[in-house]
UniProtKB/Swiss-Prot annotation:
UniProt superkingdom: Bacteria
Residues binding substrate: T49, C50, N51, R52, S107, E112, D113, Q114, Q118
GO terms of biological process kind: protoporphyrinogen IX biosynthetic process from glutamate
Active-site residues, Swiss-Prot/TrEMBL: C50
Record key words, sorted: NADP, Oxidoreductase, Porphyrin biosynthesis
Class of enzymatic activity (EC top level): oxidoreductase
Catalysed reactions listed for this entry: (S)-4-amino-5-oxopentanoate + tRNA(Glu) + NADP(+) = L-glutamyl-tRNA(Glu) + NADPH + H(+)
Name of protein: Glutamyl-tRNA reductase
Other noteworthy facts: During catalysis, the active site Cys acts as a nucleophile attacking the alpha-carbonyl group of tRNA-bound glutamate with the formation of a thioester intermediate between enzyme and glutamate, and the concomitant release of tRNA(Glu). The thioester intermediate is finally reduced by direct hydride transfer from NADPH, to form the product GSA.
The UniProt record lists the keyword GTP-binding: no
Gene source species: Alkaliphilus oremlandii (strain OhILAs) (Clostridium oremlandii (strain OhILAs))
Length: 334
């Protein structure tokens, strides 16, 4: 038995390359189904976030296909353009990488907390698809436990060190704009969080709602709402537009935007695949930020020092996983 992984992330490829691996739930179900048709593969887990897509595979020792090629084939994507923009790890390096990932030290924003939830969700979806074998289950369990231990032991980041608060900082830095009214497109988890943070910081925030889901929505306290179909009309009254949806299509299109009498000066796109047509940055006096443009944290001296403490903590969980593997293999010999 062997564990292998491969992935693409913000360090290896820009957003226009990565967004090809943003899967809907229906697509993900089909991808899992296609992967498990290979009898040499025992289990698989796919982590898909705005900054990365990674595939973890439990397989026979002599399985020699590139894991990322496996993912591409299962998703109906040509592997050729991605041959030089992904990384592959095998054996002990896989759980070490996963532990570091879950701790947030491989994130674009150092130490961010959302990745733990994303790792949990990834193994949960794999389990739901009946794609996770016991080796992957235990490996992910140990990585999540390691991340929780790190978070409770070390202070990796402040509340402000998140993509939402990075977006807030961009807004606050626009000193000459006199920003008051902000439109948030999207009422999912990210959209609600962004709306809450804006209101907490004294901005008037309006969040879009889909008409057919009005009664199912949770609306942040003191937030205004507008039907999604009226978003362009609302933009006339706004200084900033932030979009954070899971839509496979643009929520802000160039052609529709040009029809507005008064176009907001600042657009922030928190989605992958992108919500906002990138060509709008060619309009005069328009600023557009996407998840890459919001900026990655540099590895500071403080981060390097923290990394040593993190390595000491996760080593225990890596050892625990190895002990479990030895026990599991020992049972097989009885």
């Amino acid at each position: 038995m062997n564990i292998i992984m491969a992935g693409i992330d913000y360090k290896l490829a820009p957003i226009d390359v990565r967004e090809g691996f943003s899967f809907t739930k229906a697509m993900m179900k089909q991808v899992y189904s296609n992967i498990l048709k290979d009898t040499m593969i025992y289990g698989t887990v796919i982590i898909s976030t705005c900054n990365r897509t990674e595939i973890y595979i439990s397989c026979e020792e002599d399985f020699c296909v590139n894991p990322f090629e496996v993912l591409c084939n299962a998703a109906g994507i040509d592997f050729t353009p991605y041959e030089k923009v992904h990384r592959v790890k095998e054996g002990d390096e896989v759980i070490k990488h996963l532990c570091q990932l879950a701790c947030g030290v491989k994130s674009q924003i150092w130490g961010e907390d959302q990745i733990i939830t994303q790792v949990k969700n990834a193994i949960a979806v794999s389990r739901e698809m009946r794609a996770a074998d016991s080796y992957l289950e235990v490996m992910f369990r140990n990585a999540i436990a390691a991340a929780k231990k790190v978070k409770s032991t070390l202070i990796l980041n402040s509340r402000e060190n998140s993509i939402v608060h990075k977006a807030l900082k961009i807004i606050k830095d626009q000193e000459t704009m006199n920003i008051r009214e902000i439109l948030v497109i999207g009422n999912g988890e990210m959209g609600r969080l962004m709306t809450n943070v804006l209101i907490e910081n004294g901005y008037r925030a309006t969040m879009t709602l889909r008409q057919y889901r009005y009664h199912a929505n949770v609306i942040p306290l003191n937030a205004n709402t507008v039907d999604y179909s009226n978003r362009y009309e609302k933009m006339k009254d706004c200084d900033v537009v932030i979009s954070a949806t899971l839509s496979p299509h643009y929520t802000v299109e160039m052609e529709n935007l040009k029809k507005i009498d008064k176009i907001p000066k600042l657009f922030i796109d928190l989605a992958v695949p992108r919500d906002i047509d990138p060509s709008i940055k060619n309009l005069p006096n328009i600023e557009l930020y996407d998840v890459d443009g919001i900026g990655a944290d540099e590895i500071s001296k403080n981060h390097a020092q923290q990394l040593k403490g993190i390595e000491r903590i996760i080593e225990k969980y890596i050892c625990d996983y190895h002990k479990w593997c030895l026990f599991k293999e020992g049972l097989g010999c009885i």
